[in-house]
Amino acid sequence: MSLESSYTLLAPMYDFVIERPFRKIRADSLSRLPAEPSTVLVNGIGTGLDLPHLPTRHRYIGLDLTAAMLKRARPRTRGIAMNLVQGTSLALPFADDAFDHAVLHLILAIVPDPAGCLREAARVVKPKGSVLIVDKFLRKGQWAPLRRALNPLVSRLVTRVDVVFEQVLAKQPNLRLVDDRPVLFNGWIRSIRLIKNA
């Protein structure tokens, strides 16, 4: 089953499963957006669960792979300068350095090529811009035999559970890590802030 098909089927129940455990985590991550008005890419906007936590001083583009997710996000855009775009995170339909910042909440461990997704985010963010990430990651060298064993099945349906963030970041020399916090499930879910080199 393709990623687009999986998330089209999941759209009606996505909020029920994901909203509550990630509410404060999303808000805390988005509070790290700067005070000055900026242009921000919300990559993998899904049903729009980030929208209630977005500071209204910025202008946003929300991108998602599926029309079903964007349809659910649209009503949440009221009161926010937000345009919704259907597209893939692996080939963003935006020019280089188009955004001041990017938000990647629960997207890097979903796409089939996490390094490609982060590379695209780095491409469209201006130098000195930030990339805010919340997702499930293994730590480098972490054994996690059950997660690794389940990954072939789970990744075909909804998400990868074997992504090692340090390996993904190592492929992006133009991004530097400035903050990495364990936020849920004994550190499996992490909140990360990167800055693009000048």
Predicted features and spans:
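Class I SAM-dependent methyltransferase SAM/SAH-binding core
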Residues: 39-91
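A short SAM/SAH-binding and catalytic strip from SAM-dependent methyltransferases
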Residues: 101-113
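C-terminal lobe and adjacent flexible extensions of AdoMet/dcAdoMet transferase-like proteins
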Residues: 191-198
